[in-house]
Swiss-Prot record:
InterPro entries attached to this UniProt entry: EFG_II, EFG_III, EFG_III/V, EFG_IV, EFG_V, EFG_V-like, EFTu-like_2, G_TR_CS
Family label: Belongs to the TRAFAC class translation factor GTPase superfamily. Classic translation factor GTPase family. EF-G/EF-2 subfamily.
Described purpose of this protein according to its UniProt entry: Catalyzes the GTP-dependent ribosomal translocation step during translation elongation. During this step, the ribosome changes from the pre-translocational (PRE) to the post-translocational (POST) state as the newly formed A-site-bound peptidyl-tRNA and P-site-bound deacylated tRNA move to the P and E sites, respectively. Catalyzes the coordinated movement of the two tRNA molecules, the mRNA and conformational changes in the ribosome.
GO cellular component terms attached to this protein's record: cytoplasm
Gene Ontology terms for molecular function: GTP binding; GTPase activity; guanosine tetraphosphate binding; translation elongation factor activity
Compartments (UniProt record): Cytoplasm
Classification via HAMAP family: EF_G_EF_2_B (MF_00054_B)
Domain tr-type G intervals: 8-290
Residue positions binding GTP: 17-24, 88-92, 142-145
GO biological process: ribosome disassembly
Species of the source: Francisella tularensis subsp. tularensis (strain WY96-3418)
Signal peptide (residue range): none
Domain of life per record: Bacteria
Name of the protein this chain belongs to: Elongation factor G
Length: 704
């Protein structure tokens, strides 16, 4: 069966932004204008199509990325029909993981900013993630009808705070309640959308006289940006100072695809102005699956390889999200990078080493589904019937095995103990938590060995609230939740050499493992700029510790790292070098050397000046000027370090670094200080040493 839409007419895009920039409303309008939903769902009515979980509709925020397929032929029907697969991503910092997963499988993104608040903390996080995956993007400055909205100010903020080369392709006509429409800088015409039909039709009129000069200045900057795409365009521009509309599109597209520039559009999704122009921008400037570099992967032997985006290549797809559906059970969302998959086909999962059969394939529209017979390169769809797949697994052809890059997921920073309200629910709770953990890799579940309690960990208080809420609604398990606990870590501060000997020789075969290990602080970071946890170096010469036991020493040290040495918290930032030792021909074993390794760390870390680390959060508080002093005083009392201040239309913005341990219940507190007018957001920044008096308390409570 041939393809319905040619691959170059595909656009796999994400819509990402900070909470409240109007991202879900923008997506709703896209679905309305592309003809998918006949009635527009408003977020503040709790009726948005993409926000399909009950909690999302109650809280008015998007938690999980819903995926939707839609079609667009242009505002003036000027394009052939393009297929747009859209992923709507959450903007709350506790759900960064959902954004990370979506960006991993997208080819392009529309980043939405609020016209009055501009660049906010989550916008920076999203931008960093998009940079990490090299995702070309365009910007939509939304809410131009809001008080304090200023398109050019937001573009300037994107330049300075996100270090992005922003090129406006539009200019707003009026702002706040006078926002009327936009100037198209390529056609040099004003676009006025018709309010009677919710912006379905529009007229092109002359540019208002008072904006003519500014529009011409911005047009020149835009043409210069387009001309820099190639020598031919630059020559033509230098000779005549002008480029045709097609040449401008061609130049801008080439530079967006190379991640050299970011085009800026503006409008108000809520007022039905500007969204169709953004759709034209998606088709014109964002890449098709075969216009981005071939996906990198590895063969089974760990050799680097790549897969072109083509139906003729062997099948390869990435499972980027799991969801539990009340009617069909487990849904596995996949992005197909190459080849074709038909329902009923068997696929191989090289990460698990298992073969599975795909029962049915469905195309999702938020939480409604259409069954389809097959998916091809470039498609995003959900499979039903896969049992043993986790987020980040590769699915491929068993005859041609590849492993697509693994996704890196952040470590949780907050934990709470949960217990079912009735003993009868214990098993139900275990099943529910297991399913939720399979869906969300930034959520972890473990049993505390000492207390026997179930401990759940995640990215923030809201994240864990929603998990407990979903247990109640979807799995009918009522639970009691303990006070939040901080995910402390331990590390060492100095270099030490440690001998450890494990010897058991009392009749029969004994045990003998003897090692000398040098421990020192590890100051290395991984490719994401995060501190490395552990590095093991083998410097043994002359076979004093036989090759087959060296891995066991490393394993023993690594297992002991998980238990810590001061207060039972996992250790990070440790480099261990095995440089000497001895063995016994008969009594030595892998187990003996593993125990010797763990003994070496236990003894050595105490001498190496071990200390406790705590998560430090980057906190941004927006407060009216009147409450500035009180809010800053409160942050100082919480051991906060004020890093700087900015202004924005709603008041002052305080940037601070504050220990997570001091931030519990802050939301209620900051509301009462400011009579409900201040808001804040926070994300994990780094681990730092805990002050001695607090470290003593932590150790004391662990030992008691």
């Amino acid at each position: 069966m041939p393809r319905n839409t040619a691959l170059e007419k595909y656009r796999n895009i994400g819509i990402c932004a900070h909470v409240d920039a109007g991202k879900t409303t923008t997506t709703e309008r896209i679905l309305f204008y592309t003809g998918l939903s006949h009635k527009i769902g408003e977020v503040h009515d709790g009726a948005a199509t993409m926000d399909w979980m009950e909690q999302e509709q109650e809280r008015g925020i998007t938690i999980t990325s819903a995926a939707t397929t839609t079609f667009w032929s242009g505002m003036d029907q000027q394009f052939e029909k393009h297929r747009i697969n859209i992923i709507d991503t959450p903007g709350h910092v506790d759900f960064t993981i959902e954004v990370e997963r979506s960006l991993r499988v997208l080819d392009g993104a529309v980043v939405v900013f609020c016209g009055s608040s501009g660049v906010e903390p989550q916008s920076e996080t999203v931008w960093r993630q998009a940079n990490k995956y090299g995702v070309p993007r365009i910007v939509f400055v939304n809410k131009m009808d809001r008080s304090g909205a200023d398109f050019e100010r937001v573009c300037a903020q994107i330049k300075t705070r996100l270090k992005a080369n922003v090129v406006p392709v539009q200019l707003n006509i009026g702002a706040e309640e006078d926002f009327k429409g936009v100037i198209d800088l390529i056609r040099m015409k004003a676009i006025m959308w018709n309010e009677e039909d919710m912006g379905l039709t529009y007229e092109l009129v002359d540019i208002p006289a008072d904006l003519q000069d500014r529009a011409e200045e911005l047009r020149m900057e835009m043409i210069e940006a387009a001309a820099e795409a190639s020598e031919e365009l630059m020559e033509k521009y230098l000779e005549g100072g002008e480029l045709s509309e097609d040449e401008i599109h061609q130049g801008l597209r080439a530079r967006v695809l190379n991640n050299e520039i970011v085009l800026a559009f503006c409008g108000s999704a809520f007022k039905n102005k500007g969204v169709q122009a953004v759709l034209d921008g998606v088709v014109r400037y964002l890449p098709a699956p075969n216009q981005v570099p071939a996906i990198k992967c590895e063969t089974e032997d760990g050799e680097p390889a790549s897969r072109p985006s083509s139906d003729d290549a062997p099948f390869a797809a990435l499972a980027f999200k799991l969801a539990t559906d009340p009617f069909v059970g487990n849904l596995t969302f996949i992005r197909v990078y190459s080849g074709v998959l038909k329902s009923g086909d068997a696929v191989y999962n090289p990460v698990k080493g298992k073969k599975e059969r795909v029962g049915r394939i469905v195309q999702m529209h938020a939480n409604k589904r259409d069954e389809i017979k097959e998916v091809r390169a470039g498609d995003i769809a959900a499979c039903i019937g896969l049992k043993d797949v986790t987020t980040g697994d590769t699915l491929c052809d068993q005859e041609d095995v590849v492993i697509l890059e693994k996704m890196d997921f952040p470590e949780p920073v907050i934990s709470v103990a949960v217990e079912p309200k009735s003993k009868a629910d214990q098993e139900k709770m275990s099943i529910a938590l297991g399913k939720l953990a399979a869906e969300d890799p930034s959520f972890r579940v473990k049993t505390d060995e000492e207390s026997g309690q179930t401990i759940i960990s995640g990215m923030g208080e809201l994240h864990l609230d929603i998990i407990v809420d979903r247990m109640r609604r979807e799995f009918k398990v009522e639970a009691n939740v303990g006070n939040p606990q901080v995910a402390y870590r331990e590390t060492i501060r100095s270099k030490v050499e440690q001998e450890a000997k494990f010897v058991r020789q009392s009749g029969g075969r004994g045990q003998y493992g003897h090692v000398f290990v040098r421990f020192e602080p590890l100051d290395e970071v991984d490719e994401n700029g995060e501190a490395k946890v552990f590095k093991f170096v083998d410097e043994v010469v002359g076979g004093v510790v036989p090759k087959e036991y060296i891995g066991s020493v490393a394993k023993g040290i690594e297992e002991q790292l998980n238990n810590g040495v001061l207060a039972g918290y996992p250790m990070i930032g440790v480099k261990a070098t095995l440089y000497d030792g001895s063995y016994h021909d008969v009594d030595s074993s892998e187990m003996a050397f593993k125990i010797a390794g763990s003994m070496a760390l236990k003894e050595g870390a105490k001498k190496a000046n071990a200390c406790i680390l705590e998560p430090i959060m980057k906190v941004e508080v927006v407060t009216p000027e009147d409450y500035l002093g009180d809010v800053m005083g409160d942050l100082n009392r919480r051991r906060g370090i004020i890093e700087g201040m900015d202004e924005n239309p709603s008041g002052r913005v305080i940037n601070a670094l504050v220990p997570l341990a001091e931030m519990f219940g802050y939301a209620t507190n900051v509301r009462s200080i400011s009579q409900g007018r201040a808001s804040f957001s926070m994300e994990f920044k780094k681990y730092a040493e805990v002050p001695n008096n607090i470290a003593d308390e932590i150790i004391k409570s662990h030992n008691s």
